[in-house]
């Protein structure tokens, strides 16, 4: 059954040069890139904080791929990490040459970055529809406690993580069957852990990336990762299944821990993996949130009974929302390929680099040899909609390239590139496909982005 919604007038509450929809690593980087390129920028976010996966989900391992010989990206993404460290919102990450970002404290870091840049913040507003003139996007409709409102913009950046703007505006988007998507996760943290006893146990039985292959999982590596330390937890859950604490079929409960503080807080527990859930289906999201929390509590009980140092541990917090890794992607002017990310792809329209880090679909490759690929501008450009550009994990590419470009630091590369392009397109009154790449790359270099 359907109903007919009556036509109504919607108040225009704001006009801006560049509107960024979504404020995860890609959207926040896009807003900063556009602002630093001289444009008036508005950052729209459905939750009450900026930061996306870092803050709303609790993914604190921002650059856990980084090791001694990694050739890393440069630009706003590195700034997120250094500002968090300098503001007391990051600690040394246990498996890499990077910092784990405190997801709660980064809310304040993100606020600070937005305020310093003069960006107009709009929290607690949900994008619901594009405003179109033919095939040109002119703004968006949002819903909030204030009702239905309109925001107009000269250029719009889709950083929603699910290509919501592009999809509803009529751009071509692609989505795998949910059975083939990378699993979703409920992140959580514990308190009451005895740090000394826990670390002694970890050192007595160190785990490596080879141990990631278990149960329903198969993992492809290059071999060089197999002996490297990983803060991986599997054995407590095997013991718990044998003891009847965890149902036998839940052999997907396993994974990594993030930071362990002197206070006894053990954060960024990435132990719950939900397969067959579509992050664009609210019913799947509902089931995933509830099932994920149930599995997290089983995991905590298993750790309490089977891991030294966790005997008195308890739940500290869940992430605010389910962690989604894989939904819609745009069919872009250029779709990145497995060969691009595995074989050091090079592009004349590079907007930044990202190390050879592939994590997803049963593949784990860490960038320990100095190999990296360039990210092409064309992968940000959707087909079928003018004045719209995309950033984050929705950019164009195949499965294996997605396992690289979906990672948060790479999302900052596409975000900063999209932000600079949006600013220049608005200032020059040009389409995104009409920009001079020399101009885009010159501004990115001015913003300390490494292109080659």
Per-region residue spans from a language model:
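Basic/polar N-terminal segments that are highly enriched at the extreme N-terminus
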Residues: 1-11, 452
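Conserved N-terminal/central alpha/beta ligand/cofactor-binding core
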Residues: 7, 13-15, 33, 39-40, ...
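Beta1/beta-strand and adjacent pyrophosphate-binding region of the FAD-binding site
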Residues: 10-24
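N-terminal Rossmann-fold NAD(P) dinucleotide-binding loop
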Residues: 27
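Flavin (FAD/FMN)-binding glycine-rich loop and adjacent Rossmann-like elements that form
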Residues: 53, 143, 147-155, 159-452
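Aromatic/His-enriched, Gly/Pro-containing loop or helix-boundary segments
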Residues: 125-155
